[in-house]
Regions:
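A short core secondary-structure module
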Residues: 70, 74-114
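Extended amphipathic alpha-helical segments enriched in small hydrophobics
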Residues: 160-171
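A structural signal for short hydrophobic beta-strand segments in well-ordered beta-sheet cores
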Residues: 62-65
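A short, Trp-centered hydrophobic/proline-enriched beta-strand micro-motif
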Residues: 40-48
């Protein structure tokens, strides 16, 4: 894909990041949903960075308020490739009551997921998006606590390395 230009390769690269928390998740139903989406040509997104503090995961302001055995998410993410068309967006946040880290699956087509804008002037779509009273069902939680923290770092470790090659013009 990089042969045709970096913008074509970018969609694939970001999909690798979006799949990281899904592949590492103990949630088998979400892993199967991701596999089905892949088989049908779906792309994925990795909702980690925020406008105010980049990818400083200690400072994430995506808040998940408990609602029974589920959550309601509020917050925004910035510079998220494929954030407009992803089959699944893996989103990192914190439980509002405990501060526990949570990775969950979001759907850009569902109510409460608002695309703010494309933040780049290219054919790639790099989103700023906001979750506003976005319901997160218990079966959409990918990881909690240490597992969520580890999934964020492991995904970056595995998936971001390709961006270095692009930045020096190899792709």
């Amino acid at each position: 894909l990089g042969f045709y230009g970096l913008c074509y390769w970018y969609t694939w690269q970001v999909s690798i990041l979006g799949l990281g928390p899904l592949w590492m998740s103990p949630n088998g139903a979400m892993r199967r949903k991701a596999a089905d989406a892949l088989a049908n040509g779906g792309i994925f997104a990795f909702g980690l960075s925020e406008k105010e503090h980049g990818a400083d995961i200690y400072s994430t302001s995506m808040a998940l308020a408990p609602r029974g055995d589920a959550f309601v998410a509020n917050g925004s993410k910035y510079y998220i490739g494929n954030g407009n068309e992803a089959a699944i967006v893996s989103v990192f946040g914190k439980a509002a009551d405990s501060g526990e880290y949570v990775f969950f699956a979001a759907d850009p087509k569902r109510a409460g997921y608002r695309l703010v804008k494309n933040v780049v002037a290219s054919q790639s779509y790099v989103a700023e998006f906001a979750l506003e009273e976005y319901p997160v069902a218990a079966d959409e939680v990918l990881a909690r606590g240490r597992e969520a923290w580890d999934a964020s770092l492991n995904t970056v470790n595995v998936g971001k390395y390709n961006l270095g090659w692009a930045s020096i013009g190899i792709c």
